[in-house]
Structure formats: structure tokens, C-alpha cells
């Protein structure tokens, strides 16, 4: 006797497969309707997109994207966040948890050239640590357009242990849309709670006023 559940599952799989096949057929039919002029327009558009992306990558690399580097002063921090649209900054001290974070940050810096990945020693940047309320180390400040948009504090959101994967950290950073991410994890759905934002530009002005 056939298993009714199995039959239902098979029907669902066939339905999905048929829908995908129909979609592909429609796309092929659309392409077949294009004449040479239409194809040339698509080709030119694609070339422009590729050229624009190549120019972006060249600029990102010139700014230090693609590698995980250390910021040695608070002044340099402000220069970095003003130069790059997206920055992930690791506030650290010389301890094991921060070294674990360093390992994952180094990997992500190479994978996400669109974002600048840096670190700064918290104890040597007291103004920033106080202004951004950095208490637990490691803490990642996720920065967009000079604003600290979100934080990853310690390992609590990464399973609470130091054996989390680079993908776990990647997904967490992607929630703040500080990196481009093509994954399908449900954890990337935007949070409903309002994130506290601190304007780094305001911090920079305050820093200048305190001198």
C-alpha cells in the first residue's frame, strides 16, 4: 500500500519542478524574441556594469579593503570611517577571544572586498571606547556611512562559545547590511527592534572640541 505522505511529497516536488521548468522556458522564449539590436543593448549594459564594478574594486583596494588591518590611533579611525562607506571595526585586547575574532575577520576581509575590516586596541583608544560604550571585548562596531549602526558584543549572538564558524559571524554582520550577502539564512531577516545609532561625525567633532 502506497504511503499517502510520500505521495503528497512527490506531488509537491513535481509541482515545484514544473514551475521552475516553466519559468526557464519563459526566459528562453523571451531571449529568442530579442533581435540583434536588443542583444547589443544588453551586452553594452552588462559591459558598463562590469566596468563600474571594476572601478569600485580598484577604489576599495586603494582604501585598504581586501585585508584585515590595524588602526593605531583614534584619529586614523575617523579617517577610515569617512573614507569607506562600510566598515567593521574590532575593538580588542590581547586575549584569546579577540584572537579568535581576528581569525574570522581576516577571512571575511578577503571575501567581502566591498567592506573595510579593521581593528583597534580598546585600551589605547579611551575616547572611542567611552563614546561608543565599548565594555565587553571583543566587540565589533558595524559602521555604515560614518554611523555605528550595530554591534556584535562578545560571542553571545554566535552561540556563546569560541567555536563558532566564519559563516555564523558573516550572517550576523549581514543583518546590519554592512556586507553584501547572498545566503538564505532566516537569521538575516531584519530585526524589528530599533538599533541604537551613534553618529561618528558627532564623535569626531567632540574629539576636536576636547583637544
Curated annotation (Swiss-Prot):
PANTHER family from the UniProt entry: THIOREDOXIN DOMAIN-CONTAINING PROTEIN 9 (PTHR21148)
Top-level taxonomy: Eukaryota, Viridiplantae, Streptophyta, Embryophyta, Tracheophyta
Residue ranges, compositional bias (Polar residues): 184-203
Domain Thioredoxin, first and last residues per copy: 68-178
Disulfide links within the chain: none
InterPro entries noted in UniProt: Thioredoxin-like_sf, Thioredoxin_domain
Protein name: Thioredoxin domain-containing protein 9 homolog
Region (Disordered): 184-211
Superkingdom of origin: Eukaryota
Family matches, as Gene3D superfamilies: Glutaredoxin (3.40.30.10)
Organism, scientific name: Arabidopsis thaliana (Mouse-ear cress)
Amino acid at each position: 500500500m502506497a504511503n499517502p505522505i510520500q505521495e503528497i511529497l512527490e506531488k509537491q516536488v513535481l509541482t515545484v519542478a514544473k514551475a521552475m521548468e516553466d519559468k526557464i522556458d519563459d526566459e528562453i522564449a523571451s531571449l529568442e524574441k530579442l533581435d540583434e539590436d536588443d542583444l547589443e543593448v544588453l551586452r553594452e549594459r552588462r559591459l558598463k556594469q562590469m566596468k563600474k564594478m571594476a572601478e569600485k574594486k580598484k577604489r576599495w583596494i586603494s582604501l585598504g579593503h581586501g585585508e584585515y588591518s590595524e588602526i593605531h590611533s583614534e584619529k586614523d579611525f575617523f579617517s577610515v570611517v569617512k573614507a569607506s562607506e562600510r566598515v567593521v571595526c574590532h575593538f580588542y585586547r590581547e586575549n584569546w577571544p579577540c584572537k579568535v575574532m581576528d581569525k574570522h575577520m581576516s577571512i571575511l576581509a578577503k571575501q567581502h572586498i566591498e567592506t573595510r575590516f579593521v581593528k583597534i586596541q580598546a585600551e589605547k583608544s579611551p575616547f572611542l571606547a567611552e563614546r561608543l560604550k565599548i565594555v565587553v571585548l571583543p566587540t565589533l562596531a558595524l559602521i555604515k556611512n560614518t554611523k555605528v549602526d550595530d554591534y556584535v558584543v562578545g560571542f553571545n549572538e554566535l552561540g556563546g562559545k569560541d567555536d563558532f564558524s566564519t559563516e555564523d559571524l558573516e550572517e550576523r554582520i549581514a543583518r546590519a547590511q554592512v556586507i553584501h550577502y547572498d545566503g538564505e539564512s532566516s537569521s538575516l531577516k531584519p530585526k524589528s527592534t530599533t538599533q541604537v545609532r551613534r553618529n561618528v561625525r558627532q564623535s569626531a567633532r567632540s574629539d576636536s572640541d576636547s583637544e
